[in-house]
Amino acid sequence: MKVALIQKKYYGNTKKTVKKTLIDIEIASDSGAELIVLQELHQSEYFCQSEDVTFFAYANSWEKDILFWSEVAKKNSVVLVTSLFEKRTAGLYHNTAVVFDKDGTVAGKYRKMHIPDDPGFYEKFYFTPGDLGFEPIETSIGKLGVLVCWDQWYPEAARIMTLKGAELLIYPTAIGWFDEDSKKEKKRQLESWITIQRSHAIANGVPVLSCNRVGFEKDSSGVMDGIHFWGNSFICDPQGSLLAQAGEEETILYATVDRERTKEVRDIWPFLRDRRIDTYKDLLKRYCD
């Protein structure tokens, strides 16, 4: 199965950014991709660099966004993984991945469970933690374990998705560096980000697709300069081997995912078989003290 990750920068406004994204979706579809993944919050800038109530306005188009991306998926006959700002009601918002099937129907959605609150990533101000659990989304091309960005640092999320039958793990993402970070620190952060996700592929015997954004986005509050989103979107197989990896520029990243490889890998590395589920109760504690 041919898959595509669309790694884009923000073009200063939603209209232009979406227009550029639509062009790439059409290109990817024409190139034979059956599954297309977009980055986290792909319609707008990464507004979570500061706490500003005016940014909640981005969520006002939630229902229209659903209809719009549904038509995009249908027009291009692709399974489309989007990342949208969900307005559930006034004062209650989610960072939500919505998956559309090839006929435009909503196959399912996932509300981001792990919400960061770090300098430049003030997501707790905007997003309520997800309440839909870790549920794979059934589509015409298989069961997709869709998670979002900060979720990628948690092996528990990947494991539960796998135990519930996910055939792919997918991470729409927005992550990058600050200018004050040293070259060595930037290298460490990027390598850690790639390593943790490849480890999810290995530990669970499933392919991983991680789609990040690129470009520099200023901090609108002026407290910090802004974030250089590092891109490096990638696709790896069930043994963590890289099938394709992007750099720091805009691109459409393609790979062919062989889902039969999951069975082959799990037969020689039966990690699920050897789990000692009778000994894991301490995982339900915040800390063992």
Predicted regions and their residues:
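A conserved C-terminal secondary-structure "cap"
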Residues: 262-289
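Extreme N-terminal starter segment of soluble prokaryotic enzymes
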Residues: 1-4
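Cys-nucleophile CN-hydrolase/nitrilase-fold catalytic domain and related Cys-dependent amidase chemistry
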Residues: 14-15, 23-102, 109, 175-206
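Active-site catalytic loop in hydrolytic enzyme cores
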Residues: 88-196, 264, 268-270
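Short polar catalytic/cofactor-binding loops
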Residues: 7-12
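Short beta-strand scaffold segments in enzyme catalytic cores
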Residues: 82-84, 96-99, 135, 233-235, ...
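Short, acidic/polar
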Residues: 16-26, 154-159
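CN hydrolase (nitrilase-like) catalytic-core segments centered on the catalytic cysteine
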Residues: 61-81, 143, 152-252
